[in-house]
Every structure is written in structure tokens, then in C-alpha cells.
Amino acid sequence: MAILLFRVDDRLIHGQVVVGWGRPLGVNRIVLVDDQVAASEWEQDLYRMAVTPDIEVEFVTLNGATARLRDWQSDVRRTLVLTGDLETMVALHAADPVTVHRINLGGVHHRAGRRERLPYLYLTDEEMTRLAALEAAGAAVAAQDLPTTPPVTLKGLG
């Protein structure tokens, strides 16, 4: 079944990911790619509490993820790969652009220098440029908070 979704969401694992995306897609594994969380059992325990028992959770570093992308893609488990920031997703795409070919932008919230593109998506001009580079390299990039809402292409984020 492979990797069903590559998602950027700065809240990491939470209800919208587990229920909003996980259930409709039939996800039975979430892979969180985050160096800090991968090194912290305490944080891993917190995120596991947000996931139902039927969903396996893996916490991996960026280096660990780049080494395992093809394995996850060929696995029978229905997998959602989640990063908390755009930089990590860009690095995953650079490591394997064939596997990381569709990128979902979820909750990326306000910080200094970012401006609202959608109610749940704030990006700097530099981040928009990075996303345009991903598209130029062949990745399909779209913002979509839930599968029940229409995706917004990069052009629509202006």
C-alpha cells in the first residue's frame, strides 16, 4: 500500500492528522520525521497518546528517514509521513524525488516574517520560493487542511 501522504504540519501528531487524515485514508502507520522528537522518549510518549492503538507510530531522524523511504514505499502498511517543517520535507524530496512526489501542506502557523496564505497556512516569501523549486523539480505541492476540503495549489497561495 505504501506511503499515502507526505504532510508538513508544525503541530506534528494531533487529532486532525490521526482522525482527519488517518481514518479516511485507512492509515495504519504514521512516521514522524523529526530529529528532536526522535531523540526524546518523553516527547514520543506524548505523541503516542494522540494515536489510536491500531496505528503504529515511528519516530525517525531525517537521516534515518532518507535511508528508509524506499522501504516504506514498498511496505504493505498504509503510511503517512509527517514533518514539522518545510525544510525537512525539502530534504526528503531531495533524497528521493521519485518517492516524495506529492506534498501536502497542513498547519504551518504564524511566526515572524510569515504572512497568511490560508487560515491554517503562513509562509515567508523564501518558503514560497522553496515550494516553487519543489514544483519545478517535479513535486506536486498543495495545501489542504482536511481531505474533505479542496486542495489549494501553489499558484492559489499567491
Describe each PLM feature range.
Residues 9-12, 61, 123:
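A general structural motif
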Residues 1-51, 56:
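Long, hydrophobic N-terminal alpha-helical segment
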Residues 21-24, 46-51, 95-99, 120-121, ...:
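Short, solvent-exposed amphipathic alpha-helical segments in soluble enzyme
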Residues 34-38, 61-64, 86-87, 106-110, ...:
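Short, ordered loop/turn segments at secondary-structure junctions
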Residues 101-158:
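Glycine-rich, aromatic-bearing surface loops/beta-hairpins
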Residues 58-106:
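Ordered, amphipathic secondary-structure segments that act as subunit-interaction surfaces
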Residues 40, 46-50, 54-58, 67-83, ...:
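Short basic, glycine-rich beta-strand/loop surfaces that mediate nucleic-acid
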Residues 2-6, 28-31, 56-58, 78-81, ...:
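Structural motif
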